[in-house]
């Protein structure tokens, strides 16, 4: 849950600090990793791309394939809404205090995230839905999260099956400029 904005950046930064850039590049089969900075949800985020490695974030799947807006998309809230389960809270002032004072319960707390996402998948089958859609459309599973590319390919495949060739998109130059 929220691996793109939390888990992956955390792992990247830890590997970079502890092992260096060369080890970080080993995450990619082609030794090619890149990062970019984006602003979303009112904050700056560092995102990382591991060439040759794809991942699905259940947070993205949930937002894409459920049709009711939630007051919060924190895993704790979604698990309560969908499963009737809540995560246990942090008994310390900070996560660092918890980590240093009671490492075992800190680990158990983090394992809850994995178990809750697993239970959400058991109930909702969003990964299964994503993979089925990707297979049917003959696309990479990450393409299912978009809207335009997925539908373009579905339409193309449908027309191709009927031996209908669609014309190439024409390039046109803009002849006028408009303010705005």
Please annotate each region the language model reported:
Residues 3-4, 92-93, 172:
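Residue-level "edge-of-site" marker
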Residues 10-13, 119:
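Alpha-helical scaffolding segments of alpha/beta enzyme cores, especially the outer helices
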């Amino acid at each position: 849950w929220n691996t793109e904005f939390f888990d992956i950046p955390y792992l990247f930064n830890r590997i970079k600090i502890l092992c260096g850039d060369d080890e970080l590049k080993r995450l990619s089969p082609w030794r090619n990793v890149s990062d970019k900075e984006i602003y979303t949800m009112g904050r700056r985020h560092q995102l990382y791309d591991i060439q040759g490695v794809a991942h699905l974030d259940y947070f993205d799947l949930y937002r894409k394939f459920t049709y009711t807006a939630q007051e919060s998309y924190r895993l704790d809230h979604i698990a309560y809404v969908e499963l009737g389960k809540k995560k246990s809270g942090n008994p310390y002032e900070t996560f660092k205090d918890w980590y240093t004072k009671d490492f075992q319960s800190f680990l158990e707390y983090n394992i809850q995230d994995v178990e809750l996402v697993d239970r959400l998948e058991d109930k909702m089958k969003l990964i299964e839905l994503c993979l089925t859609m990707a297979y049917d459309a003959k696309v990479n599973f990450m393409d299912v999260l978009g809207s335009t590319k997925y539908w373009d390919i579905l339409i193309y495949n449908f027309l191709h099956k009927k031996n209908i060739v669609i014309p190439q998109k024409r390039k046109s130059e803009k002849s006028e400029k408009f303010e705005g």
